[in-house]
A protein has these predicted regions:
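Fungal secretory targeting signals
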Residues: 1-20
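Functionally critical loop-and-helix segments that line ligand-binding/catalytic clefts
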Residues: 21-38, 176-233
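Substrate-binding cleft of extracellular glycoside hydrolase catalytic domains
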Residues: 21-153
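Hydrophobic anchor at the start of a short beta-strand
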Residues: 82, 156-158, 183
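Glycine-rich, charge-decorated loop segments at or immediately adjacent to ligand/cofactor-binding or catalytic sites
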Residues: 94-97, 168-176
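Structural recognition of alpha->loop->beta junctions
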Residues: 103-119, 124-126, 172-201
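Short, solvent-exposed loop/turn segments at secondary-structure junctions
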Residues: 126-129, 166-170
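Aromatic-lined carbohydrate-recognition surfaces of secreted/lumenal glycan-active proteins
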Residues: 154-169
Length: 233
């Protein structure tokens, strides 16, 4: 995923059906975008087989993606299941503060069957210390603070987007989130080799950093019916 300054490599978690270590020959196509993509042909993406999109909403407690509203409206009009994501800055403010900011600017969830739970994009710091100056235990506490705040306001835990490498390096490969937080795993390869943190499988797989209609390519680990069920909660 792209921050305001850099490209990231992350995503995965949740409720799915396939073996995460097996080569994927099926699943549901989707993609993730931010203001870097500008105008997006959502109807074209839907016609080509995409059924969901994850859209950047916020970053830290000061940044709102300029195209979030238009992207969200366009995705809705095209019939795509959609949701927002928040790029974390654990060195900037508390998890609770950032979850509150995310919720105030498009990151909410409703059980309409068309809205994904919000996603926490947590990855290497594009501007400084790779783990934002936090120890593994401090990082786990920060993520929990974000997630519990989000859950208290929506009734859903957020999805967590990351890479296996970052998760191991910056959380000590914590298993604390593997039960309630769906994993969006970034791993650019023909198949998934490592699922971190005790998650039995990824819910979504960011399998490439480009997609025909913009942004990164993502695959839901299941069929269309299970994707709709996941969105509805």
């Amino acid at each position: 995923m792209k921050t305001t300054t850099a490209v990231s490599l992350l995503l995965s978690a949740g409720i799915a059906t396939a073996n995460p270590l097996a080569p994927r020959s099926s699943g549901v196509q989707g993609f993730d975008i931010s203001s870097y993509q500008g105008t997006v042909d959502f109807s074209g993406a839907y016609s080509s087989g995409a059924r969901f999109v994850i859209i950047k909403a916020t970053e830290g407690t000061t940044y709102i993606d300029a195209d979030f509203s238009s992207h969200y409206e366009g995705a809705t009009s095209a019939g795509l299941i959609r949701g927002g994501y928040h790029f974390a800055h654990p060195d900037d403010s508390s998890g609770a503060d950032q979850a509150t900011y995310f919720l105030a600017h498009g990151g909410g969830w409703t059980n309409d069957g068309q809205t994904l739970p919000g996603m926490l994009d947590i990855e290497y710091n594009p501007d400084g210390s790779e783990c934002y100056g936090l120890s593994a235990s401090e990082m786990v506490s920060w993520i929990s603070d974000f997630g519990e705040t989000y859950n208290s306001k929506t009734g859903r835990y957020p999805m967590i987007y990351s890479t296996a490498d970052w998760w191991s390096t910056c959380t000590g490969d914590s298993t604390e989130f593997s039960t309630n937080y769906p994993l969006v795993l970034a791993q650019y390869a023909s198949s998934i080799s490592t699922v971190p943190g005790g998650w039995p499988y990824q819910s979504f797989w960011q399998n490439a950093d480009s997609y025909t209609y913009g942004g990164d390519s993502d695959i839901w680990n299941g069929d269309s019916a299970s994707l709709s069920k996941f969105a509805k909660g």
